[in-house]
Regions:
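Low-acidity, Ser/Thr- and Arg-rich intrinsically disordered low-complexity segments
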Residues: 2-10, 17-18, 24-29
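Alpha-helical, largely C-terminal catalytic domains
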Residues: 33, 103, 162, 166
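Auxiliary, metal-adjacent structural segments of Zn-dependent hydrolase domains
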Residues: 33-82, 89-93, 137, 141-142
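Short, amphipathic alpha-helical segments
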Residues: 45, 125-132, 144, 148
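Secondary-structure capping and boundary motifs in well-ordered enzyme cores
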Residues: 91-96, 123, 127
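Active-site recognition of the HExxH zinc-binding catalytic motif
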Residues: 97-110
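Post-HEXXH active-site segment of zinc metalloproteases
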Residues: 108-137
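Long, well-structured alpha-helical subdomains associated
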Residues: 142-196
Length: 196
């Protein structure tokens, strides 16, 4: 079961009861301040073309938004990535983990569902959990990023997991998500590697 509440103008998701092995709270209620984002890896820290090429492998388009402009389709606002259809929107100050998380929401959807997406990709807990795993794998496919950095930035942003960190979740507590991703043709098991 999942409940939604408003806190400081943000949607904060909490799951009231979850099976063993799943994410306890997808995003924690924290006040995001500019200093927090400055410590995270952002799109301006890596090559835009590398990220665009990675997303294109999954039929997605990355659209650069000018600095200081609002990001279309951003669920969280500020510098967080946005989604409209098969396009991911990001600015130079968008955290890479945010861009990958939102892109993964589209990647796990079939094309007919992607076309309907605007801002909020899913209400599926299974998809949300799988996205947390997939974004770390995509991090390894981007020069200058890497899964370790993506997982650390997820923790800093405020994701909360039962085992205490995003890395512990992905490595020790996400078997159902790995199985879900494999069933949807996105990862190979037991290697735990990307198919594309």
């Amino acid at each position: 079961m999942r409940s939604t509440r408003r806190s400081s103008g943000r949607n904060v998701l909490f799951q009231a009861s979850r099976p063993v092995g799943a994410v306890r709270a997808i995003r924690a209620s924290i006040a995001l301040i500019p200093e927090t984002f400055r410590t995270m890896l952002t799109l301006s820290d890596i090559a835009f073309d590398d990220v665009a090429a990675l997303l294109a492998r999954y039929g997605l388009r990355l659209e650069r938004v000018a600095d200081g402009e609002p990001i279309p389709g951003s669920y969280w606002g500020e510098c967080e990535a946005g989604l409209i259809g098969s396009t991911v929107y990001a600015r130079g100050d968008t955290p890479v983990h945010s861009l990958l998380h939102e892109a993964c929401h589209l990647i796990v959807l079939p094309p007919e569902r992607r076309a309907q997406v605007h801002t909020d990709a899913t209400d599926s807990i299974e998809e949300e959990d799988a996205v947390c795993v997939l974004q770390s794998l995509l991090g390894d496919a981007i020069p200058g990023a890497g899964s370790e950095r993506i997982l650390a930035d997820m923790d800093e942003w405020g994701y909360t997991f039962r085992l205490g960190s995003a890395r512990a979740y992905v490595e020790q507590d996400a078997e159902s998500s790995w199985q879900w991703l494999a069933a949807h043709g996105l990862v190979k098991l037991p290697e735990r590697s990307l198919i594309r």
